Amino acid sequence: ADLAHRQQSVNRLLYKIYSPISSAYAELKQLSTDNXD
């Protein structure tokens, strides 16, 4: 149970880190697509 709890904490931390990065990346991709048009 302790291992599962730790895994959950790690997942939450990774999500906190990667969520803004991936959304910013999506915005950049959208911008470059608009630019090429």
Swiss-Prot record:
Keywords assigned: Copper, Oxygen transport, Secreted, Transport
Subcellular compartments: Secreted, Extracellular space
UniProt tissue specificity: Hemolymph.
Gene Ontology MF annotations: oxygen carrier activity
One of the GO biological process terms: oxygen transport
UniProt keyword Transport, yes or no: yes
GO cellular component, one term: extracellular region
Family: Belongs to the tyrosinase family. Hemocyanin subfamily.
Described purpose of this protein according to its UniProt entry: Hemocyanins are copper-containing oxygen carriers occurring freely dissolved in the hemolymph of many mollusks and arthropods.
Protein name: Hemocyanin subunit B
